[in-house]
Amino acid sequence: MKRCICVLLVSTVLFGGCMNRNRVANTFVQVEKALAVAPDSAMRLLKDIPAKSLGNQAMRARYALLYIDAAERAQLNENTDSLLRIAWRYYRKHPQEMQNRCRTLYYMAHSKLRQGDKPGALRLFLEAEENNDSLDNPRDRGMLYLSIGDVYRGELNFVRAYRYY
């Protein structure tokens, strides 16, 4: 009898954890859909996710990257450096997640630009471009090339800027 109760209790806890993880994953899918048309709604969905439900590193990294993306698209001037570190800590070790790795590099480069570090930003943009060639997301690629061109234009290197525009 005790064994049966223990098994039932353990299975309930495990099942509840899986349900919570699925709920968060479904919220992430909704956020990705809302990013293009309503980034402020995506931000609200992300803020409604309790921190306890982001159990593993992969979920925390995905949350961080989605939050950064939503803040950028909603044109909020939030300091997202700590979230960038969370995302980078995970994605630099997982090359199979190349698209998220490139997006993290892109946002890290923008953070460097905001700090006034153009050479550091350019290095990160070019690293993202190097890895981005195998991807077929036209929006991300276009934003990356536009940013690289802007940095070169700011340095008065119009020949290289023209190549990226």
Question: Can you annotate each of these PLM segments?
Answer:
Residues I5-V13, G17-Y165:
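A "functional boundary" signal
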